[in-house]
Amino acid sequence: MQYDPIKRVLGNIFNHSTWSRKLFYQLLDLLLLRTWHIKKAIRKWSRTIDGAASILDAGSGFGQYSYFLARKNPSWQILGVDVKEEQIEDCQHFFKKAGLTNANFLLADLTKFIHQESYDLILSVDVMEHIEEDGKVFSNFYQSLKKNGLLLISTPSDKGGSDVHHTNEKHDQKISFIDEHVRDGYSVEEITTKLKNAGFSKVDVAYSYGWPGKISWKLSMKYPISLLNVSKLFFIILPIYYLAIYWFALLMNLLDINLNHNTGTGLIVKAQR
């Protein structure tokens, strides 16, 4: 399935005003389970930081994580980078109108982006599955972190991440829900090895999207996006659909962030320089 066209439509719908963009961020916060996991990790990290911090939002997209960080602590300086010019322009316009002067945005390719020893935290949410040269990006992240700086990653795992499933009984062919991914997901061992090869000394990997998260993702993301990929007319019934499933999906999200998972379709990775 092509995910980018849906994102462009959503961007066009919610870019009309500052309040609509804020509403869009709130909806993403409620519906995207990975946001719950990332914010939990950021809150834990923030308790180790006294005062100002420099943060890189690597693959900032719609800018919802930069928005969260910029509002959480005005002394933090956030740089969001992305390869999509329209998203950088949208974020620059919105953050200026919202009066958030501690966040800036830059068009950049992560395979070439290095700011030597500049950041206390680098955030990479659902980005690495889109980049073929991941080893180069991990090395760039390492070089761009300050000593003891933290890299925080959310990415699909190899346990069914990207909703990968076999197409026949022989299990020799697989398809992914998201066509734009260059890899279906990482194993714990693979991403740990690649990060250590990049220079990181301490790597912690935990599964996200366990059984509760998988149910929530299907209800809140897979089924609606699949319908929208058929016809944009389904936008009309989405509010009714989400009212019907929201509280159950919320319960599943709460369970997912509070349980330890032996397996899951997502990974939350923390790597320290």
Indicate where each model-derived feature is located:
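S-adenosyl-L-methionine-dependent methyltransferase catalytic module, highlighting the catalytic core
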Residues: Q2-H37, Q64, V83-Q87, F94, ...
